[in-house]
């Protein structure tokens, strides 16, 4: 829902989740509280000071990876883990939270696509004529989709990059609306940066995309890391908002697949097997 550092203590914040208006704040101890906006204290306005003792039944919530998470239901499992976050020398921060007029599954699928790098992120994540997506592996379990052995030439792979390199990627989808990218570190090829997109489904065709960063970088400032991520995602935002339909079609015949779409094909099949209906166009029965 939000980076915890951006939630004002005692201030009322509002957002949408699955089409429902949600409120949240932090108490005097800094602990987060989330509730349905129908339980807001009387005459409270967004941004106003709120007495959290007057709030009705709170929703389940977790603070993880520096973000506030909630649900409208009662899940029987915990949020997925990112073990790299436990490494003490990493820079862990929110690269920015942006509204995008597209479904959460469309945003995940775009994140998985290496084929658009030379055309959308020209001079940064790709460049012509080096446009080939080499063969890579995809494994699917009930818990996740995992793509390994992904490689792509990138002129500027990261904020700290000093020149072009063939970057090694691993993609992981541990949640229908969340996707992680592990990419080789320019200064230390034995380690990988982690970049994730945590998509908050505000409605079926609108998201708040939270850009998570866990970086091995002792050179760049926080602002430099955030600026680079926002530059990349800003380029994607234009493409995403021009997608049609905005919901992701799950029928394998809906769009013509190519090699670059291998992860996307597995992701769509995974969603279909899970019976996901929110933000997708279901396959014909």
Task: Tell where the protein language model's regions lie, with residue ranges.
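C-terminal catalytic domain of Rieske-type non-heme iron oxygenases
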Residues: 17, 76-285
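Rieske [2Fe-2S] iron-sulfur-binding domain
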Residues: 2-92
């Amino acid at each position: 829902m939000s980076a915890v550092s951006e939630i004002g203590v005692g201030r009322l914040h509002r957002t949408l989740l699955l089409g429902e208006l949600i409120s949240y704040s932090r108490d005097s101890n800094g602990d987060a509280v989330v509730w349905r906006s129908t339980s807001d204290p009387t005459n409270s306005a967004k941004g106003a000071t709120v007495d959290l003792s007057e709030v009705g039944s709170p929703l389940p919530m977790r603070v993880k990876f520096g973000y506030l998470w909630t649900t409208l239901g009662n899940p029987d499992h915990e949020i997925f883990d990112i073990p790299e976050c436990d490494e003490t020398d990493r820079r862990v921060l929110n690269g920015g939270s942006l509204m995008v007029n597209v479904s959460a599954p469309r945003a995940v699928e775009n994140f998985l696509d290496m084929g658009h790098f030379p055309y959308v992120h020209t001079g940064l994540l790709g460049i012509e004529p080096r446009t080939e997506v080499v063969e890579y592996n995809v494994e699917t379990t009930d818990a996740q989709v995992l793509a390994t052995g992904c490689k792509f030439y990138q002129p500027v792979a990261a904020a700290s990059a000093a020149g072009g390199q063939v970057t090694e990627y691993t993609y992981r989808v541990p949640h229908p609306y969340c996707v992680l990218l592990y990419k080789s570190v320019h200064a230390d090829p034995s380690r990988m940066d982690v970049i994730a997109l945590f998509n908050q489904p505000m409605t079926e065709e609108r998201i708040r995309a939270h850009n998570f960063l866990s970086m091995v970088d002792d050179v760049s400032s926080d602002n430099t890391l955030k600026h680079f991520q926002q530059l990349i995602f800003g380029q994607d935002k234009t493409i995403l908002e021009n997608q049609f339909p905005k919901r992701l079609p799950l029928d394998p015949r809906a769009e013509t697949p190519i090699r670059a779409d291998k992860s996307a094909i597995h992701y769509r099949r995974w969603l279909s097997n899970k019976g996901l209906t929110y933000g997708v166009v279901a396959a014909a029965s």
